[in-house]
């Protein structure tokens, strides 16, 4: 009887996770579609001059944040992220080359696809270790790390609205653009550096882990 109940529980758990993944994948697809719509309207309003004063930053920022979090939440459902990571890095490189050649006034360097490629390649080999932390604890630590590092591009570390540290200027330059420490002359229409966004990605990963742990607790 116990084996039968355990098997029924595993089946119901598997069905619940599959349903969660379907919902999350649909949201992720909607987020990428939203990004495509954004660039379509950006091209009309800003690039072509229909409305040069169009305030687009908030829309772009929220869309990129949502993509990073959702990709983190769906990370556990995949397996071959070496292939995905290299593929996304290739897409990001192609986008950078195309914008450099065809729209040099609106280039995209180290955008969302480049970041996701790096995130997949970095997180996959340590995913087993990250899972040792409870979802709630991992999410909290990732959120704190994100908050501490989200102003690195400005050369400061801020905690609860107060500057608690300054980074030396020699750390900033072309060699550290990918990390989140660009030089003063760096320009990119879409910039998603490794820091602080890797912690936002981990927030998504741990949020899904917490949801899964919570459901298992309810089932018991």
Where would I find each of the regions flagged by the language model?
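Alpha-helical transmembrane segments and their immediate juxtamembrane cytosolic regions
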Residues: 1-220
